Amino acid sequence: MVICVDRVRKKTDKFLDTIYKSNPKNEYLKSDTIDVSVKTPRVVRGITRIDLIKQFLDNNIDFYYIDTGYMGCYPKKLWHRFTKNNFQTLDHLNYKQLDFLTDINLLKKRFRKIMMVDYDSYKPKRPVEGDSILIIPPSAKVLRCLTVMKHTDFTQEQYIDYITKEIRKYTDKRIVVRQKPNRDERTRSGQNLKDQLKRDKVHCLVAFNSIAAFEAIQEGYPAITLGPNCANFLAKTELNDIEKPYFADDDKIREHSLYLSACQFNIEEFRNGYAMKQVEQLQHHPTYNRYKKVII
């Protein structure tokens, strides 16, 4: 049983409504506060619900979080990540573990739908040396979230300035900053991340929590992740190796791509209960990543 908590507005969130209707024991309400005496797990969608999420954490209430998927989201956003007690899936399961815990053949069928390639034929791209460093700063929404959670207290400008100076300690490569475009711009040819990685001949991408880090690795570009990130398993978290950045081997990239594909779902999978079942089977009852405050 879960309680789906929607925003206070006329419109009903279709994902929360779908989860609510997937089990007769589930509940649905529109609220910006919670009854802390009720410990039933809650479900929310989107980073704008951070004030509510903080209430969950402060009162030891488990929560499930819905947001854009890790892959297969262009041109249409058909897949959504579904995580427990975090904003992204931060752990990893290898192929043998997935095969033991769930239907691996079904995962492979889903992988083909998402990636448009058979898992057994999927060969990750290998990196080539580039001549620029691409910084993906936290968006305004993310910075507000981090501030509410007391993880940070800096502005985007301060972050960019600090990271630029840190990068300069280790390389003289050209530095490019990519501000997060709106969805229309991200889906337009020439504006998406893949196009910019090629156009700017990127040597390494530096991100905080952006899923762009995982997208870059799948395209054959090394990434460094400085915060909680679904790509942490495939990336280093320090800037000192940026001149010769780490790049995971093919097996790690393939298996992590399969795992993340198993942690994102379409609307039908939320409706029939598959999404909730998979989260419980594959995400190991995680606790919130209460990382040390970042001071710039």
Regions found by a protein language model. Name each.
Residues T40-P41, S132, H203-C204:
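Structural motif
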Residues W79-G130, L234-I296:
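Leloir-type glycosyltransferase catalytic cores
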Residues R45, Y65-T68, R178, F208, ...:
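Generic beta-sheet signal
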Residues P127-D184:
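Conserved catalytic-core segment of nucleotide-activated headgroup transferases in glycan assembly
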Residues S31-V36, K165-A223:
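Donor nucleotide-activated moiety binding/catalytic core segment of transferases
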Residues P24-W79:
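Extended catalytic core of nucleotide-activated donor transferases of GT-like folds
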Residues M1-I47, K141-V142, H284-I296:
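N-terminal pre-catalytic "stem/leader" segment of glycosyltransferase-like enzymes
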Residues V8-K11, T48-I50, G69-G72, P138-V142, ...:
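Short, solvent-exposed loop/turn segments at secondary-structure junctions
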